[in-house]
Structures are given as structure tokens and as C-alpha cells.
């Protein structure tokens, strides 16, 4: 990175992604046969009946959940380096913590996929949301160098798998012909949440000269996300036989 700077690095990443994703997208452009849509629609309609709410209301809830979870998630991701600088550890240590967090986020994304296959998207999202909230709380009580590395590792192990589970929930509960638009809306909400959360946390720091209230703000947004996901899980769990939802 030093020879080209962070701007050049980002530009290079963009070029690599465009060169890789566009050909891969063209390879998968063919639509599934109509019979596949009909089978999938029957399955999602039954699952939606278990939850007992309309597709539109469900989509609104998922958009709100996506926005709130990423508003919370953005606090450490955006401000961890500056936070370490304020604590006197230096921005280089903060960058190392952030790299550790992001690396474990990759592990989290893959691992969450295996977990979702076993217990379903909503249950996986609920676990990830809860543990992300726990990690945010830990940032409030531990500010030693070693402990911050540990907390950042915990945060990374659970935050990375949260966003992909929204696509799984959309696929499980929303009509297949609407899945593309639904996933696009929910993922867009997560991106807006990341932008808003990063800015708002910085604004809180500017007003209070402390990251403590910024972390508390993240905890509150995370609690809102957890409440939505737990409510969806509870509604389906109470309307299905024991264990049925966990293997959906």
C-alpha cells in the first residue's frame, strides 16, 4: 500500500472486483426453470404463514433490522483506529486490530453459512446480533491493548456473518420472484446504516470528546436489531412444532 497510497489501493480493489464479478455474473445470468419457481414459492408461502405477517411488512422489518445492525457495526469498524490513537496506542495498533477483525469476519461469513444450513437464517442472525452486542459492551469495559485485540477478535467472529443471513431470510420467507429486489433493498439498508453509524458515532465523539457514548449508541442500535430478529424468530417458533424452525 505505501507506494500507491490508500486511494490507489481502493481504486485497485475496485478494478479487481469489477474484472472478477462481471464475468461471474454473466455466467449465472440464466433464470431457473418455471417449475423451480413454483416449488420454491410453495415452500416460502408455508414458511411465511408460520410467521403470520405480510411480505411487505416482513420486508420493512428486515430493512429496519439491516439498517440498525450496521449502524451498530460501523462504530468499531470506522472508529477503532482513531480510538486506539486516543488511548495512546497509536494508529498502527488500531490498524492491526481492524485487520484482525476483518480477517475473522471472513471466517464468520463462511461459518455462519454452515450454521444457517443447520438452524435457519433467523436463528443464525439472532445469535450473531446478540454476540455483536456483547462485543460492543465489552469495548465499554476493556481498553487495555491486549484486551482490545481480544474484543476486536470476538467482534469480528460474529459481525462478519450477519449481513449474509439477511439474504438467507429473504430466500426463506419472501416470494422467490421478489427475492432479488428484497435482498437489494435490505443490503442497501445495511450500507446506509454503515454510513450513518460511522458519521453519527463521529458526531457523538465531537460533542462529548469521548467514544463511550458512541459505543453506547451502537449498543442501543444493536438492541433494536436484536428485538426485531428475536420477535420474528418467536413468531415463527410459536406457530410451528418444536424444532421445525431450527431446521428450516
Where is each model-derived feature located?
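Flexible cytoplasmic inter-helical loops of multi-pass small-molecule transporters
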Residues: 29-48, 239-247
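Helix-to-loop junctions at the C-terminal end of transmembrane segments
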Residues: 108-120, 205-206
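C-terminal ends and interior cores of transmembrane alpha-helices
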Residues: 131-143
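A late C-terminal transmembrane helix in Major Facilitator Superfamily
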Residues: 173-210, 217-218
Amino acid at each position: 500500500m505505501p507506494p500507491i497510497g490508500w486511494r490507489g489501493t481502493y481504486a485497485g480493489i475496485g478494478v479487481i472486483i469489477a474484472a472478477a464479478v462481471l464475468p461471474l455474473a454473466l455466467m449465472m445470468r440464466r433464470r431457473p426453470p418455471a417449475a423451480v419457481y413454483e416449488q420454491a414459492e410453495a415452500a416460502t408461502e408455508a414458511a411465511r404463514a408460520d410467521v403470520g405477517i405480510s411480505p411487505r411488512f416482513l420486508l420493512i422489518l428486515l430493512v429496519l433490522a439491516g439498517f440498525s445492525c450496521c449502524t451498530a457495526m460501523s462504530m468499531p469498524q470506522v472508529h477503532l483506529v482513531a480510538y486506539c490513537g486516543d488511548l495512546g496506542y497509536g494508529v498502527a495498533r488500531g490498524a492491526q486490530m481492524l485487520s484482525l477483525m476483518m480477517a475473522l469476519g471472513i471466517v464468520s461469513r463462511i461459518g455462519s453459512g454452515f450454521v444457517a444450513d443447520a438452524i435457519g437464517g433467523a436463528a443464525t442472525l439472532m445469535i450473531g446480533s446478540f454476540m455483536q452486542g456483547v462485543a460492543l459492551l465489552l469495548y465499554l469495559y476493556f481498553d487495555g491493548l491486549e484486551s482490545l485485540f481480544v474484543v476486536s477478535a470476538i467482534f469480528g467472529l460474529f459481525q462478519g456473518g450477519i449481513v449474509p443471513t439477511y439474504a438467507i431470510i429473504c430466500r426463506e420467507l419472501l416470494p422467490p420472484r421478489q427475492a432479488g429486489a428484497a435482498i437489494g433493498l435490505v443490503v442497501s439498508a445495511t450500507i446506509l446504516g454503515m454510513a450513518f453509524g460511522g458519521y453519527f458515532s463521529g458526531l457523538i465523539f465531537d460533542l462529548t470528546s469521548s467514544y463511550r457514548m458512541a459505543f453506547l449508541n451502537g449498543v442501543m442500535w444493536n438492541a433494536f436489531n436484536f428485538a426485531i430478529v428475536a420477535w420474528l424468530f418467536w413468531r415463527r417458533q410459536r406457530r410451528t412444532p418444536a424444532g421445525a424452525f431450527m431446521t428450516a
